[in-house]
Structure formats: structure tokens, C-alpha cells
Amino acid sequence: MRSESEVSISTVFLGEYVGDDEKSLGILMGGSTSCMVGMNSAFVNDTIRLDLPTPSSPQITTRIVSLVIVLFNTLVFRSPLFLFSIFICLIYKFHSCFEGKPLYQMLKI
């Protein structure tokens, strides 16, 4: 298992597990609550596993939702800097909507 001091990176892996014929999508969630997951079948229980649709009936929604979960986990929960940058962008957007007047003048009573 990874120590809590290591950098947490979420990864999307698309492929086949050892000893398994069907293709599956394993989402490796980063963080101190999970461990690094390899191709070994002993670690399959540590992944969130979603079966991929067959080519005759593609379900793009399942793939998109799983990617959104990974991105949301990586960006929001693991990076306070990301939240801070969104906050700064919102303040800048609010500031620019009022013809460049400083924010403190807009809030004066």
C-alpha cells in the first residue's frame, strides 16, 4: 500500500485482467484509502469495476460517468489549489461584469 505522503494520482485503466477474458474498466482511485492496483488478480477487489458494453450496443454514458468520477475525485477532493483557482476565476468574472469597478466598491452600502 502507498503511504499517505506519496502523491495521489487517479488513473483510468482500460484492458483485461489476468485470468479474465472479458474487458473491463478499472478506476484506480488515488488517496490514502486505496492502494496501487496492478494486473495481479489478487488486487482486483481494490478497483471499481465496470463492464464495458459490446461494440454492437455502445453505452457512452457509462464511460463518461466513470471518467467524470475520476476527474472529480482527482481535482476537487485532492487539490485545494484547484478550488482556490475556481474561486479566483469567479471573483474575476464578477469583477469584470461591472465595468472594472473594484469589488469592494460594489459591496459598499
UniProtKB/Swiss-Prot annotation:
Q: Is Transmembrane included in the keywords of this UniProt record?
A: yes
What name does the UniProt record give this protein? Putative uncharacterized membrane protein YAL047W-A
Bilayer topology annotation: Multi-pass membrane protein
GO CC annotations, alphabetized: membrane
According to its UniProt entry, this protein's organism is Saccharomyces cerevisiae (strain ATCC 204508 / S288c) (Baker's yeast)
The entry's localization annotation reads:
Membrane
Residue ranges of the TM segments: 24-44, 68-88
Keyword field: Membrane, Transmembrane, Transmembrane helix
Q: What else is known?
A: Partially overlaps GEM1.
